[in-house]
Amino acid sequence: MAQNSHLILCVDDELVGLRVRKILLERAGYRVLTAMDGASGLSIFESEPIEAVILDYSMPGMHGGEVAGRMRQIKPRIPILLLSAYIGLPAEVTSLVDLYMTKGEGAPVLLKKLESLLQPVSTS
């Protein structure tokens, strides 16, 4: 599928979901770093050449909206895809990210949305 080596950061406090997503993305040709909480995710985001973020909304400590807001301050142009088990997150949260999807939408949708975020923007 994707023949690239984009570096993706996945942040989720659910270990099983994080591992499954990492395997899925690696099989699609991506390089993947993971973090199990917002603080760890921010540390990796600051220190690594991350090209896109897949971020869970519901996490202890800092929720995904808070993490996305901090990421926007650090590297405003890095695309962020927010995942949530909830439908209808507040606009103040979804406005901080490039795309939002529910976890129930599945792997093919996740890969397609991530691919769309990584497409070069046409200037014509």
Task: Show which residues each predicted segment covers.
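Receiver (REC) domain active-site loop signature in two-component systems and cognate sites
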Residues: 59
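Two-component/phosphorelay signaling modules centered on CheY-like receiver
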Residues: 15-33
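Active-site beta3 strand of CheY-like receiver
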Residues: 48-54
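Non-catalytic signal-transmission and effector/linker regions of two-component phosphorelay proteins
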Residues: 1-7, 108-124
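Acidic catalytic/metal-coordinating carboxylates
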Residues: 37-40, 63-67
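Conserved phosphotransfer cores of two-component systems
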Residues: 46-48, 71-77, 95
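Active-site residues of response regulator receiver
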Residues: 12, 56
